[in-house]
């Protein structure tokens, strides 16, 4: 969703008599604003022409100064151009500061453009699980940030093992990336992320369910969001029970594999029993790797603000879609004005005569999309991309460039499953996998985008979507996208 911006064009003539003085071009900020973009220009005129510097003040203080080094800059609540301070944008009189360093006899005219971005809903993409040199990763903080930016991500969670030092090493706001503070509680009996608080854990040394309950409960009291990580991983499963305080489960950890299928099946069972648990995913990236990469999977979060708290609010509401890659298949599910993470109220169900669903699918490349409810799979669609629009992309193109076939690439990813189970990892329950007796409908998608409609039933607890892609020569499919549910209020 594009930002709706309001634009001002301001002009300030500068006379020779004002040379070597500081001038203000005032403008008013009214109502909520999350970002201000400023650009300026004037006729330079070569060596004998004017030289005008620029900066910015708020109603309270000087916000920053570029001198003559920049022609444009921005300030936001949590991001800003280097040389400027991020922070809440207060209402009142602001001013662009002009430094009239050199002004010719004929004077100069400076044109200043000011754009305001109001808070608005938008999808933001990021990675909610990664490591750095602050624990057992090899990425420095700058390397991790650069990697995430190169992948087109807009936020990253700092989740090193049992330490908060990474959060304090990244105190300065980044111009392009939101940095979500976090920690991965890493015990000998399982791992859990705590997001949103720089120093959430008092003590990570938990060895019993009671100690885990105390530690995670205290983290939540401090404002932390708790996600149980890779709970069915053969080498580090969650063995402290599911009665501890938590908000989400990491259904998708790194490449799609059996441990994720088991987490997905468990999550589906909990949803079908009426329990509301948010599904999350993250790369768990530690170092450069062909398969484990920042943003694989990507968490797309619907947020009302380009801030850490805005992203966390979207996550807490369950407004999360998980994608294999930042540019891979993405889906949206809605019933009228109620979307992913929302509960459709009973009065709306009755007024609509059920639950009419709208399904939007973007960037699909031959995926099979399944609509799930608490009863299982309700409908299946095969998304067929016309031949002239079916060029390989994402990880498929990457594999080809590396000289690998897609089959070998995915086969190597699935080799992660070679780890021996510890005996505490449950089998995938019958009926909880993507296998279904529902006949798929063939849908041709022009430019890999399609909109579908489905008439849902009022007696379902929820609806959610999965998209998978079969790989020729393998008996397994790879998840390309999945949504959190849209819930249905029951009578």
Question: Which residue ranges define each predicted feature?
Answer:
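Solvent-exposed, flexible loop/coil segments flanking beta-strands in beta-rich domains
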Residues: 1-42, 113-124
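Extracellular and analogous surface-interaction loops
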Residues: 25-34, 84-90, 349-351
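Noncatalytic modules at the cell exterior or secretory-pathway interfaces
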Residues: 34-37, 86-105, 460-464
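Edge beta-strands of jelly-roll/beta-sandwich modules across compartments, strongly enriched
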Residues: 48-50, 104-115
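Beta-sandwich interaction modules
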Residues: 71-90, 451-455
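Charged catalytic cores and adjacent phosphate/nucleic-acid-binding surfaces used
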Residues: 113-118, 188-202, 235-491
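Catalytic cores of extracellular degradative/oxidative enzymes
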Residues: 133-275, 283, 289
């Amino acid at each position: 969703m594009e930002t709706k911006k309001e634009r001002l064009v301001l002009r300030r003539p500068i006379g020779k008599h004002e040379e070597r003085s500081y001038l203000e071009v005032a403008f008013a900020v009214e109502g909520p604003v999350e970002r201000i973009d400023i650009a300026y220009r004037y006729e330079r005129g070569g060596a004998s022409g004017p030289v005008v510097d620029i900066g910015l003040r708020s109603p309270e203080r000087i916000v920053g100064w570029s001198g003559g080094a920049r022609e444009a800059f921005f300030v936001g609540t949590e991001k800003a151009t280097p040389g400027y301070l991020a922070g809440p944008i207060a209402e009142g009189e602001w001013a662009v500061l002009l430094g009239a360093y050199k002004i010719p006899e004929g004077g100069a005219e400076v044109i200043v453009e000011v754009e305001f971005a109001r808070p608005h809903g938008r999808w933001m993409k990021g990675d909610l699980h990664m490591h750095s040199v602050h624990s057992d990763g090899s990425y420095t903080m700058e390397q991790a940030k650069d990697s995430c930016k190169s992948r087109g991500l807009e936020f990253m969670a700092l989740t090193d093992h049992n330490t908060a030092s990474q959060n304090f090493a990244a105190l300065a706001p980044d111009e392009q990336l939101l940095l979500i503070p976090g920690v991965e509680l890493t015990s000998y009996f399982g791992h859990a992320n705590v997001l949103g608080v720089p120093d959430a854990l008092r003590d990570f040394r938990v060895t019993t369910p009671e100690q885990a309950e105390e530690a995670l409960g205290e983290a939540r009291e401090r404002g932390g969001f708790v996600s149980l990580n890779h709970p069915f991983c053969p080498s580090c499963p969650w063995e402290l029970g599911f009665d501890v305080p938590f908000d989400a489960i990491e259904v998708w950890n790194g490449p799609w594999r059996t441990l994720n299928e088991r987490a997905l099946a468990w999550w589906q069972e909990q949803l079908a029993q009426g329990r509301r648990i948010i599904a999350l995913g993250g790369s768990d990236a530690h170092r450069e790797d062909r398969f484990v990469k920042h943003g694989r999977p990507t968490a797309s979060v619907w947020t009302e603000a380009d801030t850490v708290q805005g992203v966390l609010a979207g996550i807490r509401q369950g407004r999360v879609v998980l994608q294999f890659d930042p540019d891979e298949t993405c889906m949206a599910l809605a019933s009228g004005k109620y979307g992913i993470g929302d509960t459709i109220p009973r009065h709306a169900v009755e007024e609509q005569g059920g639950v009419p669903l709208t399904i939007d699918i973007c960037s699909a490349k031959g995926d099979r999309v399944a609509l799930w409810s608490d009863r299982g799979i309700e409908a299946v669609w095969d998304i067929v991309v016309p031949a002239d629009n079916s060029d390989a992309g994402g990880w498929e193109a990457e594999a080809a460039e590396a000289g690998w076939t897609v089959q070998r690439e995915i086969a190597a990813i699935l080799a992660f499953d070679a780890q021996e189970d510890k005996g505490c990892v449950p089998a995938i329950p019958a009926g909880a996998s993507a296998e279904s007796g529902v006949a798929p409908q063939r849908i041709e998608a022009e430019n890999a985008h399609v909109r579908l409609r489905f008439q849902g039933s009022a007696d379902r607890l929820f609806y959610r979507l999965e998209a998978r892609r079969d790989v020729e020569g393998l008996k397994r499919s790879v998840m390309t996208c999945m949504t959190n549910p849209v819930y249905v209020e029951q009578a």
